């Protein structure tokens, strides 16, 4: 998409959010700089009705970026040796074509408002488009209270290759790891799997819930994830593919050991 179109989208958002105009004026005019500004403004935008003109431009841009990143079909990924229904994949979760990908959300469930933050919540919302925040806001308005730790909600995937996003809030570990933290993380995996099965979904891809901004120890989190998935798959035959999606080499090594 041309630089002029991205600049037009930025102007549309700045018209809604004039409080950011002075900061935006300091951003360079290269395509990369203006695209980063667009992501920042989208991250900052609070839930409110979206214009059809903006949505058309946004969807065209995000669709083109999705194809440029490359779409990965989770059903075509090689299975781990220990279970034909489980796969391990290292990379960007927003590339995965699955019935659902799992987002490690916060209790507000509205996505990350920190401009261009490097968390999974920000990455998923930025790739899906502003419709995802609108959908989450609608869920939260009906619910009337923050999302509890260990539960799950589902939305459409919008501009993601995944059909749906399952949002779950993992435990925050600020000191020593406790049995309560472990139980809450286990509940996240069970809730996501149960919701996927209830909706008739055949494939689901998990990020490493709580191991980033929420500081759950990586090895302990992976042990819980693998245990809960294996236990669920012994009782449920409807889900045909579960992917453990990792981003860091450290996580890949941990999962390779657990799944061997």
Q: How should these model regions be labeled?
A:
Residues 1-260:
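Macrodomain-like recognition of ADP-ribose-binding/processing modules
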């Amino acid at each position: 998409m041309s630089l002029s179109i991205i600049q037009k989208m930025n102007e549309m958002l700045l018209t809604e959010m004039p409080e950011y105009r002075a900061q935006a004026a300091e951003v360079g005019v290269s395509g990369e700089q203006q695209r980063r500004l667009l992501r920042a403004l989208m991250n900052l935008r609070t839930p409110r009705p979206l214009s059809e003109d903006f949505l058309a431009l946004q969807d065209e841009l995000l669709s083109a970026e999705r194809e440029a990143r490359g779409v990965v079909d989770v059903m075509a990924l090689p299975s781990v040796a220990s279970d034909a229904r489980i796969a391990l994949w290292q990379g960007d979760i927003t590339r995965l074509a699955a019935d659902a990908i799992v987002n490690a959300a916060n209790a507000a469930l509205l996505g990350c408002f920190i401009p261009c933050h490097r968390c999974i919540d920000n990455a998923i919302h930025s790739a899906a488009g502003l419709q995802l925040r609108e959908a989450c806001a609608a869920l939260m308005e009906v619910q009337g209270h923050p999302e509890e730790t260990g539960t799950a909600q589902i939305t459409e995937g919008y501009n993601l290759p995944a059909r749906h996003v399952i949002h779950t809030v993992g435990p925050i570990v600020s000191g020593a790891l406790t049995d309560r933290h472990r139980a809450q993380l286990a509940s996240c995996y069970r809730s996501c799997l149960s919701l996927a099965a209830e909706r008739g979904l055949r494939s689901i891809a998990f990020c490493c819930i709580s191991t980033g901004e929420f500081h759950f120890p990586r090895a302990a989190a992976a042990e819980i994830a693998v245990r809960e998935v294996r236990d669920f798959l012994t009782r449920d035959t409807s889900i045909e593919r579960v992917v453990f999606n990792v981003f860091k080499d450290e996580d890949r090594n941990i999962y390779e050991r657990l799944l061997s």
